[in-house]
């Protein structure tokens, strides 16, 4: 059985590079510093949130360790943005799924606006929930600023088509100014299960591979962890983007157990 993995050297080297990227984002590119004056504040908030998460952590699957940290010191001060890796294949995969379902309205939790959401807005209305602000874009995109771990304004079993792409790995880590705590991940999973209608489709993606917490950037999930999280939903398809950024449709989940940083694409149905 072929396993998709790409070794990137000792973990401490990766950690050091991520810290350099987090502390000195103006090195790549320099213009980041010139337009962002929240540098000292971001450092302080990282350590505040690290201490809060460490004190409140009740999830033994993701122990918090400084050596695995992935400091994201500016994201909380920015509007919903753009990240390159995984996103082209991920957004194409999910938008194709929504298009083929022929729904007239789709709901999304925090996915990339200028990729997946824009694709879907061509052929259906999209209602977007995100904790960060979003300016008006076009008539087919409706935005509600909301915490997806607490969707009190969304009725039970009310959504037939739902997505959240490259979002859940960040929940509870404070990266985007969201509440800090390990319970936020499960809270969001519970909300998805609650609001999804019977027969409803859920398109979901997160980083997959060797499971770890890279505070305060993200989690990387074992595929089995994701399947356990959504045990109340039926898995329709598992596809993945490997460490070399190549897309594999209808992949074998076991081949990604040793991946370093791949992306799992999950199609669930309630």
Question: Language-model features: where?
Answer:
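Class I S-adenosyl-L-methionine
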Residues: 223-270
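A conserved beta-strand element that flanks and buttresses the S-adenosyl-L-methionine
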Residues: 163, 168, 172
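Conserved N-terminal segment of class I S-adenosyl-L-methionine
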Residues: 9-151, 155-157, 165
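Conserved beta-strand signature within the Rossmann-like core of class I S-adenosyl-L-methionine
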Residues: 199-207
């Amino acid at each position: 059985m072929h396993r998709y993995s790409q070794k990137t050297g000792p973990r401490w080297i990766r950690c050091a590079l991520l810290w350099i990227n987090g502390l000195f984002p103006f090195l790549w590119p320099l213009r980041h510093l010139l337009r962002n004056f929240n540098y000292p504040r971001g450092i302080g908030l990282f350590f505040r949130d690290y201490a809060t998460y460490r004190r409140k952590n009740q999830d033994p699957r993701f122990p918090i360790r400084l050596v695995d940290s992935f400091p994201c010191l500016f994201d909380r001060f920015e509007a919903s943005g753009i990240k390159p890796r995984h996103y082209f294949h991920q957004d194409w995969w999910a938008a194709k799924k929504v298009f083929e379902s022929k729904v007239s309205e789709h709901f999304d939790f925090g996915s990339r606006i200028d990729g997946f959401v824009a694709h879907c807005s061509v052929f259906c209305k999209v209602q977007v929930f995100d904790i960060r602000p979003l300016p008006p874009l076009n008539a087919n995109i409706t935005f509600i600023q909301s915490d997806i771990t607490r969707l009190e304004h969304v009725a039970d079993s009310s959504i037939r088509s739902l997505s959240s792409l490259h979002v859940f790995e960040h929940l509870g880590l404070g990266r985007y100014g969201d509440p800090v705590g390990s319970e936020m991940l499960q809270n969001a999973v519970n909300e998805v299960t609650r609001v999804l209608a019977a027969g409803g489709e859920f398109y979901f993606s997160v980083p997959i591979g060797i499971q770890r917490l890279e505070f305060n950037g993200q989690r990387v999930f074992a595929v089995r962890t994701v399947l356990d999280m959504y045990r109340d939903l039926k898995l329709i398809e598992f596809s993945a983007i490997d460490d070399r950024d190549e897309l594999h449709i209808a992949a074998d989940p076991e081949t990604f157990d040793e991946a370093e940083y791949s992306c799992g694409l999950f199609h669930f149905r309630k």
